[in-house]
Amino acid sequence: NKQKSFDRSYKAGYSGITGASSLSGYIAHLSEGYYVADLRGSNNYNPYDNLSNPWLNVLGAESYLINPKSPTGDSWNSIVGNGTNTAGDLYVREKGSIDEYNFNVGGNIYNVFYWGLGIAVTDFSYDIQSGYGENFTGGYISPGSPNVDGWYLMRNALHTNGSGIKVNLGVIMRATDNFRLGFAFHTPNYYKMTDSYVASVKYDFNESGTPHEGLKETPSGSYDYEFQSPWRMIASAAYVFGQSGILSFDYEYTSSNNMSFDDPYSVDAFYKTNQEITEMVSPMHTFKIGGEFRITPQISARLGYAYQTSPVKSEYRSGREIPTAGTLTMFTLDRETNYFTVGLGYRFSNVYVDMAYMHRYRRSELFPFSPLPAAVDNPYNPDQTEPLLAISPQISSLTDHNNSFVLTLGVKF
Protein backbone atom coordinates (compact mmCIF):
# COMPACT_ATOMS: atom_id res chain seq x y z
CA ASN A 1 0.00 0.00 0.00
CA LYS A 2 1.25 3.48 -0.85
CA GLN A 3 1.00 5.49 2.38
CA LYS A 4 2.34 8.78 1.05
CA SER A 5 3.47 10.37 -2.21
CA PHE A 6 6.05 13.16 -2.23
CA ASP A 7 5.56 14.06 -5.92
CA ARG A 8 5.22 17.79 -6.56
CA SER A 9 6.95 20.66 -8.37
CA TYR A 10 6.82 24.36 -7.60
CA LYS A 11 8.68 27.61 -8.18
CA ALA A 12 8.81 31.14 -6.81
CA GLY A 13 10.15 34.48 -7.99
CA TYR A 14 11.62 37.25 -5.83
CA SER A 15 12.22 40.95 -6.44
CA GLY A 16 13.69 43.75 -4.36
CA ILE A 17 16.18 41.41 -2.68
CA THR A 18 18.56 43.04 -0.20
CA GLY A 19 21.58 41.73 1.65
CA ALA A 20 19.26 40.71 4.48
CA SER A 21 16.97 38.73 2.14
CA SER A 22 19.64 37.24 -0.15
CA LEU A 23 20.96 33.70 0.06
CA SER A 24 24.45 35.20 -0.04
CA GLY A 25 23.61 37.30 3.02
CA TYR A 26 22.38 34.18 4.80
CA ILE A 27 25.63 32.33 4.04
CA ALA A 28 27.74 35.34 5.06
CA HIS A 29 25.95 35.50 8.42
CA LEU A 30 26.53 31.78 9.03
CA SER A 31 30.21 32.13 8.09
CA GLU A 32 31.11 34.67 10.76
CA GLY A 33 34.06 33.29 12.73
CA TYR A 34 35.43 31.15 9.90
CA TYR A 35 38.75 32.38 8.52
CA VAL A 36 39.47 32.82 4.82
CA ALA A 37 42.15 30.13 5.04
CA ASP A 38 39.50 27.72 6.39
CA LEU A 39 36.83 28.21 3.72
CA ARG A 40 38.86 28.77 0.56
CA GLY A 41 41.00 26.02 -0.89
CA SER A 42 44.57 26.03 -2.16
CA ASN A 43 46.87 23.62 -3.99
CA ASN A 44 47.53 21.62 -0.83
CA TYR A 45 44.28 22.19 1.08
CA ASN A 46 40.73 21.02 0.37
CA PRO A 47 38.29 22.87 2.67
CA TYR A 48 35.71 20.08 2.27
CA ASP A 49 38.10 17.72 4.07
CA ASN A 50 37.99 19.94 7.17
CA LEU A 51 35.24 18.42 9.33
CA SER A 52 34.74 21.77 11.08
CA ASN A 53 33.65 23.46 7.85
CA PRO A 54 29.96 23.51 6.86
CA TRP A 55 29.82 22.71 3.14
CA LEU A 56 27.39 25.57 2.48
CA ASN A 57 29.92 28.09 3.82
CA VAL A 58 32.74 26.61 1.71
CA LEU A 59 30.60 26.59 -1.44
CA GLY A 60 29.63 30.22 -0.90
CA ALA A 61 33.22 31.32 -0.26
CA GLU A 62 34.66 29.52 -3.28
CA SER A 63 32.05 30.92 -5.69
CA TYR A 64 32.29 34.58 -4.52
CA LEU A 65 28.80 34.59 -2.99
CA ILE A 66 30.51 35.73 0.18
CA ASN A 67 33.76 37.68 0.31
CA PRO A 68 36.07 38.48 3.24
CA LYS A 69 36.09 41.93 4.78
CA SER A 70 39.89 41.56 5.10
CA PRO A 71 42.22 39.18 3.20
CA THR A 72 42.89 36.90 6.18
CA GLY A 73 39.99 37.74 8.48
CA ASP A 74 37.02 35.78 9.81
CA SER A 75 34.22 38.20 8.87
CA TRP A 76 32.35 38.09 5.56
CA ASN A 77 30.26 40.29 3.27
CA SER A 78 27.42 39.23 1.01
CA ILE A 79 27.87 39.90 -2.70
CA VAL A 80 24.46 41.61 -2.44
CA GLY A 81 24.74 44.81 -0.41
CA ASN A 82 23.53 48.40 -0.09
CA GLY A 83 22.18 49.66 -3.40
CA THR A 84 22.42 46.30 -5.20
CA ASN A 85 19.48 45.76 -7.57
CA THR A 86 18.63 42.07 -7.20
CA ALA A 87 15.98 39.59 -8.32
CA GLY A 88 15.85 35.85 -7.70
CA ASP A 89 14.14 32.57 -8.57
CA LEU A 90 13.61 29.24 -6.85
CA TYR A 91 12.48 25.98 -8.42
CA VAL A 92 11.93 22.66 -6.66
CA ARG A 93 10.99 19.18 -7.80
CA GLU A 94 10.22 16.43 -5.28
CA LYS A 95 9.55 12.76 -5.98
CA GLY A 96 9.17 9.62 -3.94
CA SER A 97 6.82 7.63 -1.76
CA ILE A 98 6.33 5.62 1.41
CA ASP A 99 5.13 2.09 0.62
CA GLU A 100 3.91 -0.30 3.29
CA TYR A 101 3.61 -4.09 3.28
CA ASN A 102 1.34 -5.52 5.98
CA PHE A 103 1.21 -8.94 7.61
CA ASN A 104 -1.89 -9.24 9.81
CA VAL A 105 -3.72 -11.69 12.04
CA GLY A 106 -7.04 -11.17 13.76
CA GLY A 107 -9.98 -12.78 15.47
CA ASN A 108 -13.11 -12.16 17.48
CA ILE A 109 -14.68 -13.20 20.75
CA TYR A 110 -18.39 -14.10 20.58
CA ASN A 111 -18.79 -11.69 17.63
CA VAL A 112 -18.66 -8.83 20.13
CA PHE A 113 -14.98 -8.09 20.58
CA TYR A 114 -12.75 -8.03 17.49
CA TRP A 115 -8.97 -7.73 17.52
CA GLY A 116 -6.16 -7.40 15.02
CA LEU A 117 -2.38 -7.44 15.18
CA GLY A 118 -0.10 -6.53 12.30
CA ILE A 119 3.52 -6.03 11.38
CA ALA A 120 4.21 -3.41 8.72
CA VAL A 121 7.42 -3.28 6.68
CA THR A 122 8.02 0.10 5.06
CA ASP A 123 10.05 1.28 2.08
CA PHE A 124 10.98 4.97 2.03
CA SER A 125 12.24 6.81 -1.06
CA TYR A 126 12.58 10.57 -1.49
CA ASP A 127 14.33 12.74 -4.09
CA ILE A 128 14.57 16.51 -4.24
CA GLN A 129 16.24 18.68 -6.85
CA SER A 130 16.29 22.43 -6.34
CA GLY A 131 17.81 25.52 -7.85
CA TYR A 132 18.04 28.99 -6.34
CA GLY A 133 19.53 31.86 -8.33
CA GLU A 134 19.96 35.62 -8.17
CA ASN A 135 20.88 38.16 -10.83
CA PHE A 136 21.97 41.65 -9.89
CA THR A 137 23.73 44.90 -10.70
CA GLY A 138 25.83 46.89 -8.26
CA GLY A 139 27.07 43.94 -6.22
CA TYR A 140 30.17 43.67 -4.04
CA ILE A 141 33.26 41.47 -4.24
CA SER A 142 35.78 44.01 -2.96
CA PRO A 143 34.57 45.75 0.25
CA GLY A 144 32.99 49.14 -0.42
CA SER A 145 32.99 48.77 -4.22
CA PRO A 146 29.49 48.19 -5.70
CA ASN A 147 30.88 47.48 -9.17
CA VAL A 148 29.84 43.86 -9.80
CA ASP A 149 27.12 42.76 -12.22
CA GLY A 150 26.13 39.16 -12.86
CA TRP A 151 24.26 36.11 -11.70
CA TYR A 152 24.63 32.81 -9.88
CA LEU A 153 22.65 29.58 -9.57
CA MET A 154 22.96 27.13 -6.68
CA ARG A 155 21.74 23.60 -7.40
CA ASN A 156 21.08 20.87 -4.84
CA ALA A 157 20.28 17.19 -5.25
CA LEU A 158 19.34 14.94 -2.32
CA HIS A 159 18.26 11.30 -2.38
CA THR A 160 17.01 9.57 0.77
CA ASN A 161 16.11 5.90 0.96
CA GLY A 162 15.47 3.52 3.79
CA SER A 163 13.36 0.76 5.25
CA GLY A 164 11.51 0.42 8.51
CA ILE A 165 9.30 -1.79 10.62
CA LYS A 166 6.45 -1.14 13.04
CA VAL A 167 3.63 -2.95 14.86
CA ASN A 168 -0.08 -2.08 14.64
CA LEU A 169 -2.69 -3.17 17.19
CA GLY A 170 -6.43 -2.59 16.92
CA VAL A 171 -9.64 -3.59 18.68
CA ILE A 172 -13.34 -3.06 17.94
CA MET A 173 -16.18 -3.61 20.40
CA ARG A 174 -19.78 -4.00 19.26
CA ALA A 175 -21.43 -2.18 22.15
CA THR A 176 -24.92 -2.74 20.72
CA ASP A 177 -26.28 -4.20 17.51
CA ASN A 178 -25.88 -0.78 15.90
CA PHE A 179 -23.05 0.93 17.77
CA ARG A 180 -19.32 0.19 17.44
CA LEU A 181 -16.31 1.52 19.36
CA GLY A 182 -12.73 1.13 18.19
CA PHE A 183 -9.18 1.80 19.31
CA ALA A 184 -5.84 1.35 17.54
CA PHE A 185 -2.22 1.98 18.40
CA HIS A 186 0.62 2.15 15.90
CA THR A 187 4.14 1.98 17.30
CA PRO A 188 6.86 4.24 15.90
CA ASN A 189 8.35 3.13 12.62
CA TYR A 190 12.02 2.31 13.16
CA TYR A 191 13.92 3.26 10.00
CA LYS A 192 17.46 2.77 8.79
CA MET A 193 18.12 5.62 6.33
CA THR A 194 20.79 6.77 3.89
CA ASP A 195 21.16 10.29 2.48
CA SER A 196 23.15 10.93 -0.73
CA TYR A 197 23.75 14.54 -1.74
CA VAL A 198 25.70 16.95 -3.93
CA ALA A 199 25.53 20.70 -4.61
CA SER A 200 27.03 23.20 -7.03
CA VAL A 201 27.14 26.92 -7.80
CA LYS A 202 27.48 28.23 -11.33
CA TYR A 203 28.36 31.91 -11.43
CA ASP A 204 29.20 34.66 -13.91
CA PHE A 205 30.28 38.00 -12.41
CA ASN A 206 31.88 41.06 -13.99
CA GLU A 207 33.83 43.30 -11.62
CA SER A 208 34.52 46.51 -13.60
CA GLY A 209 35.73 44.50 -16.59
CA THR A 210 37.35 41.69 -14.58
CA PRO A 211 35.47 38.41 -15.11
CA HIS A 212 34.77 35.91 -12.35
CA GLU A 213 33.01 32.89 -13.77
CA GLY A 214 33.00 29.19 -13.19
CA LEU A 215 31.35 26.17 -11.59
CA LYS A 216 32.10 25.07 -8.04
CA GLU A 217 30.88 21.71 -6.77
CA THR A 218 30.88 19.92 -3.46
CA PRO A 219 32.04 16.32 -3.29
CA SER A 220 29.30 13.70 -3.50
CA GLY A 221 28.44 12.77 0.07
CA SER A 222 26.43 10.11 1.87
CA TYR A 223 25.37 9.54 5.46
CA ASP A 224 23.74 6.59 7.24
CA TYR A 225 21.49 7.17 10.24
CA GLU A 226 18.40 5.93 12.04
CA PHE A 227 15.01 7.61 12.30
CA GLN A 228 12.12 6.91 14.64
CA SER A 229 8.77 8.18 13.34
CA PRO A 230 5.94 9.34 15.65
CA TRP A 231 3.63 6.84 17.28
CA ARG A 232 -0.10 7.13 16.55
CA MET A 233 -3.26 6.49 18.53
CA ILE A 234 -6.72 6.25 16.94
CA ALA A 235 -10.16 6.23 18.56
CA SER A 236 -13.30 5.63 16.52
CA ALA A 237 -17.05 5.28 16.80
CA ALA A 238 -19.57 4.09 14.23
CA TYR A 239 -23.32 3.70 14.01
CA VAL A 240 -24.91 1.16 11.68
CA PHE A 241 -28.33 2.02 10.23
CA GLY A 242 -29.64 -1.49 9.74
CA GLN A 243 -28.87 -2.70 6.22
CA SER A 244 -28.94 0.78 4.67
CA GLY A 245 -25.74 2.50 5.78
CA ILE A 246 -23.14 3.46 8.37
CA LEU A 247 -21.80 6.71 9.83
CA SER A 248 -18.34 6.81 11.45
CA PHE A 249 -16.13 9.26 13.35
CA ASP A 250 -12.38 8.93 13.92
CA TYR A 251 -9.87 10.89 15.96
CA GLU A 252 -6.15 10.34 15.44
CA TYR A 253 -3.32 11.64 17.62
CA THR A 254 0.17 11.69 16.09
CA SER A 255 3.06 12.37 18.46
CA SER A 256 5.07 14.40 15.93
CA ASN A 257 7.14 16.03 18.67
CA ASN A 258 8.43 12.59 19.73
CA MET A 259 10.10 11.63 16.45
CA SER A 260 13.89 11.45 16.66
CA PHE A 261 17.13 10.82 14.78
CA ASP A 262 20.09 8.73 15.86
CA ASP A 263 23.59 7.90 14.65
CA PRO A 264 24.55 4.46 16.02
CA TYR A 265 28.24 5.38 15.78
CA SER A 266 28.03 8.69 17.65
CA VAL A 267 26.65 9.51 21.08
CA ASP A 268 25.47 13.07 20.44
CA ALA A 269 25.39 13.58 16.64
CA PHE A 270 21.65 14.39 16.70
CA TYR A 271 21.36 15.73 20.26
CA LYS A 272 20.69 19.31 19.13
CA THR A 273 18.42 18.21 16.28
CA ASN A 274 16.22 16.16 18.61
CA GLN A 275 16.03 19.08 21.04
CA GLU A 276 14.92 21.36 18.21
CA ILE A 277 12.19 18.91 17.20
CA THR A 278 10.63 19.04 20.67
CA GLU A 279 10.84 22.85 20.64
CA MET A 280 9.43 23.46 17.15
CA VAL A 281 7.03 20.58 16.50
CA SER A 282 3.64 19.97 18.08
CA PRO A 283 1.44 16.85 18.01
CA MET A 284 -0.91 16.49 15.04
CA HIS A 285 -4.64 15.96 15.45
CA THR A 286 -6.73 14.42 12.68
CA PHE A 287 -10.53 14.37 12.65
CA LYS A 288 -12.40 12.15 10.18
CA ILE A 289 -16.07 11.70 9.37
CA GLY A 290 -17.37 9.26 6.81
CA GLY A 291 -20.57 7.68 5.66
CA GLU A 292 -21.67 4.79 3.49
CA PHE A 293 -25.11 4.42 1.96
CA ARG A 294 -26.23 1.14 0.42
CA ILE A 295 -28.01 1.96 -2.85
CA THR A 296 -28.80 -1.67 -3.63
CA PRO A 297 -27.78 -4.88 -1.86
CA GLN A 298 -24.72 -4.96 -4.14
CA ILE A 299 -23.82 -1.26 -4.62
CA SER A 300 -22.76 1.25 -1.95
CA ALA A 301 -21.79 4.93 -2.13
CA ARG A 302 -19.28 6.53 0.24
CA LEU A 303 -18.41 10.07 1.26
CA GLY A 304 -15.70 11.26 3.65
CA TYR A 305 -13.88 14.29 5.00
CA ALA A 306 -10.75 14.65 7.15
CA TYR A 307 -9.05 17.64 8.76
CA GLN A 308 -5.43 17.49 9.95
CA THR A 309 -3.77 20.17 12.06
CA SER A 310 -0.31 21.61 11.41
CA PRO A 311 2.69 19.93 13.09
CA VAL A 312 4.55 23.26 13.36
CA LYS A 313 4.19 25.51 16.41
CA SER A 314 2.75 28.87 15.37
CA GLU A 315 5.60 30.96 16.78
CA TYR A 316 8.01 29.43 14.25
CA ARG A 317 6.07 31.01 11.38
CA SER A 318 6.95 34.52 12.53
CA GLY A 319 10.70 34.79 12.13
CA ARG A 320 12.24 32.16 14.39
CA GLU A 321 15.31 30.35 13.10
CA ILE A 322 14.67 26.92 11.55
CA PRO A 323 18.06 25.16 11.31
CA THR A 324 18.70 23.17 8.13
CA ALA A 325 21.35 20.55 7.39
CA GLY A 326 23.85 20.56 4.56
CA THR A 327 23.64 22.83 1.52
CA LEU A 328 19.88 22.47 0.93
CA THR A 329 18.47 25.60 2.55
CA MET A 330 14.86 25.73 1.30
CA PHE A 331 11.96 24.19 3.23
CA THR A 332 8.20 24.41 3.67
CA LEU A 333 6.13 24.71 6.86
CA ASP A 334 2.77 23.03 6.39
CA ARG A 335 -0.44 24.46 7.76
CA GLU A 336 -3.65 22.44 8.07
CA THR A 337 -4.57 19.78 5.50
CA ASN A 338 -8.05 18.91 4.23
CA TYR A 339 -9.06 15.62 2.59
CA PHE A 340 -12.25 14.97 0.60
CA THR A 341 -13.17 11.47 -0.61
CA VAL A 342 -15.99 9.89 -2.62
CA GLY A 343 -16.32 6.27 -3.66
CA LEU A 344 -18.44 3.43 -4.95
CA GLY A 345 -18.34 -0.21 -3.90
CA TYR A 346 -19.72 -3.31 -5.57
CA ARG A 347 -20.26 -6.64 -3.80
CA PHE A 348 -21.34 -9.86 -5.45
CA SER A 349 -20.87 -13.35 -4.10
CA ASN A 350 -17.13 -13.69 -3.33
CA VAL A 351 -15.97 -10.73 -5.41
CA TYR A 352 -15.82 -7.05 -4.47
CA VAL A 353 -14.68 -3.93 -6.34
CA ASP A 354 -14.09 -0.52 -4.74
CA MET A 355 -13.41 2.75 -6.56
CA ALA A 356 -12.41 5.88 -4.67
CA TYR A 357 -11.37 9.44 -5.48
CA MET A 358 -9.47 11.59 -2.96
CA HIS A 359 -8.65 15.29 -3.12
CA ARG A 360 -6.07 16.76 -0.75
CA TYR A 361 -5.82 20.50 -0.16
CA ARG A 362 -2.88 21.87 1.81
CA ARG A 363 -1.38 25.30 2.48
CA SER A 364 2.27 25.93 3.38
CA GLU A 365 4.85 28.67 3.72
CA LEU A 366 7.86 28.35 1.40
CA PHE A 367 11.20 29.58 2.75
CA PRO A 368 14.24 29.85 0.42
CA PHE A 369 16.30 29.76 3.63
CA SER A 370 15.77 30.32 7.33
CA PRO A 371 15.43 33.66 9.11
CA LEU A 372 18.35 34.39 11.43
CA PRO A 373 18.06 36.50 14.59
CA ALA A 374 20.19 39.59 15.08
CA ALA A 375 23.19 39.25 17.39
CA VAL A 376 21.88 41.55 20.12
CA ASP A 377 21.49 41.09 23.86
CA ASN A 378 17.69 40.96 23.65
CA PRO A 379 16.74 39.19 20.39
CA TYR A 380 13.03 39.96 20.81
CA ASN A 381 10.82 42.99 20.60
CA PRO A 382 9.25 44.20 23.87
CA ASP A 383 6.16 42.05 23.29
CA GLN A 384 8.48 38.99 23.25
CA THR A 385 6.80 37.50 20.16
CA GLU A 386 8.72 38.76 17.12
CA PRO A 387 12.51 38.35 16.96
CA LEU A 388 14.76 41.07 15.60
CA LEU A 389 16.21 39.61 12.43
CA ALA A 390 19.59 39.94 10.78
CA ILE A 391 18.43 37.74 7.88
CA SER A 392 14.82 37.90 6.74
CA PRO A 393 14.00 35.88 3.59
CA GLN A 394 11.02 36.58 1.37
CA ILE A 395 8.42 33.98 2.34
CA SER A 396 5.93 32.68 -0.23
CA SER A 397 2.54 31.05 0.22
CA LEU A 398 2.30 27.61 -1.33
CA THR A 399 -0.98 25.82 -2.00
CA ASP A 400 -1.08 22.33 -3.43
CA HIS A 401 -4.01 20.26 -4.63
CA ASN A 402 -3.47 16.53 -4.98
CA ASN A 403 -5.92 14.18 -6.68
CA SER A 404 -5.72 10.40 -6.52
CA PHE A 405 -7.83 7.49 -7.69
CA VAL A 406 -7.80 4.05 -6.10
CA LEU A 407 -9.26 0.86 -7.56
CA THR A 408 -9.43 -2.23 -5.34
CA LEU A 409 -10.39 -5.72 -6.51
CA GLY A 410 -10.82 -8.49 -3.98
CA VAL A 411 -11.85 -12.12 -3.80
CA LYS A 412 -13.07 -13.82 -0.63
CA PHE A 413 -12.16 -17.48 -0.14
Segments (PLM) and residue ranges:
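Outer-membrane beta-barrel porins/channels
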Residues: 1-413
